[in-house]
Amino acid sequence: MTSALLGLQIVLAVLIVVVVLLQKSSSIGLGAYSGSNESLFGAKGPASFMAKLTMFLGLLFVINTIALGYFYNKEYGKSVLDETKTNKELSPLVPATGTLNPALNPTLNPTLNPLEQAPTNPLMPQQTPNELPKEPAKTPSVESPKQNEKNEKNDAKENGIKGVEKTKENAKTPPTTHQKPKTHATQTNAHTNQKKDEK
């Protein structure tokens, strides 16, 4: 029965396509939905034979689709989930109460501390107190320039290094050459003012 309905469904689909393509369009192009004719499907008038045939074939197509759905559901009413096999022979996930070993389970044996048993990181070298530096490294201090010069002189004397002292001349920055003197700018302003006065 379902194979006959399926064949009829295919024939109806092909017939609907052919009948719709043979019909004359009710309106042309984009002007179908505007202008004097305000109806959606074109001018209302007596329906032609092709229009009636299209409606009849469409109604048969819908009825055939509903019938196919009903018969397929009746014939193959089983779900895929109904056909899956379940194993009832599975062992329980939680073991019996007497089989737990309290020596290995930290929740049952409070004497075990998981932090004490944690392995150390083999990538990190272990430092002993003998390897620590004797004096901390000197950090630069934020002091006045005079105090910094005194500290540098004292450090140079302690370390035995000569010629480290800075002079005030070395600390100054040389003047830049890209700056223009202001006298030139004032001369040009005076020159432009004279031109304005002449006009």
Swiss-Prot record:
GO MF annotation, one: protein-transporting ATPase activity
Compartmental location: Cell membrane
Keywords: Cell membrane, Membrane, Protein transport, Translocation, Transmembrane, Transmembrane helix, Transport
Domain of life: Bacteria
Pfam family, one: SecG
Coiled coil ranges: none
Main location: membrane
Biased composition (Basic and acidic residues): 146-171
GO biological process: one example: protein secretion
Membrane-spanning ranges: 2-22, 49-69
Region: Disordered, residue numbers: 92-199
GO annotation, cellular component aspect: plasma membrane
InterPro entries, sorted: SecG
Membrane topology type: Multi-pass membrane protein
Comp. bias regions, Low complexity: 97-115, 172-188
PANTHER family reported in the protein's UniProt record: PROTEIN-EXPORT MEMBRANE PROTEIN SECG
Main function: Involved in protein export. Participates in an early event of protein translocation.
NCBIfam families (alphabetical): secG
UniProt record similarity statement: Belongs to the SecG family.
The protein, known as: Protein-export membrane protein SecG
